[in-house]
Amino acid sequence: MSDPISFKVILVGDGATGKTTFVTRHITGEFRKQYISTIGVEIRQLPFYVAGQSCPNGREVLLNVHDTAGQEKFGGLRDGYYVDSDACLLFFDVTNRVTYKNVESWYRDVFRICPTRRDASTGEEKPLAIVLVGNKCDVKDREIRTQTVKFHRSKNIPYVEISAKDNFNYELPILSILRTLLNDPTIQFSQAPALLPADIGMDAATREQINKDLEAVNNVPLPDDD
């Protein structure tokens, strides 16, 4: 197995969109937690084990996940939270239209401070790896339907919907950023991430429809006037 490699991942988005829950439901390997009061952030180091064309014998990846610890409720985040990031998971709540409207502002803040990352293998400057994450897709009374989400297409970033209560698609945001950071679209988990048991169970038809809609919104280009 190749030597472990580590990356800094930041979680951004309005409060109560599920950022902290997303991290704490991952219980793979050793769980480390650190709080840095100067920038109001909790850091959790999560290990993932992957394999692909670039690492056929497998590789351990350590994600140092920086969580706001609720600081976004008090007038934004300090610039130090963003500095030297390799990847960003940008959250909104599909049951709250305001959190989706605020995605643009969060995206702007991130790229004002950290528009690029240093490639792990070449040392070149590359765009920050970012994934748009719509949480709480298990709720039937959604305010934001999958088909209406367009922000990711205007920025050419992936969009994933997840359910913290169901563990639905929970591995996809991490897998997406790992493929970008390791420059390898064939990357898969060689060991499935261990998650806390699901609180609910979405029916198979709902799961299938959401993933079908996600495939459509991730592959259909925006109209010229959007």
Swiss-Prot record:
Where in or outside the cell it occurs: the entry states:
Nucleus
A cellular-component GO term for this protein: nucleus
For biological process, the GO terms are: protein import into nucleus; ribosomal subunit export from nucleus
Q: Where is this region: Switch-I?
A: 33-41
Question: What positions does the entry give for GTP binding?
Answer: 14-21, 70, 135-138, 163-165
Family annotation (SUPFAM superfamilies): P-loop containing nucleoside triphosphate hydrolases (SSF52540)
Q: How does it assemble?
A: Found in a nuclear export complex with RanGTP, exportin and pre-miRNA.
What is the role of this chain? GTP-binding protein involved in nucleocytoplasmic transport. Required for the import of protein into the nucleus and also for RNA export. Involved in chromatin condensation and control of cell cycle.
In its UniProt entry, what is this protein called? GTP-binding nuclear protein Ran
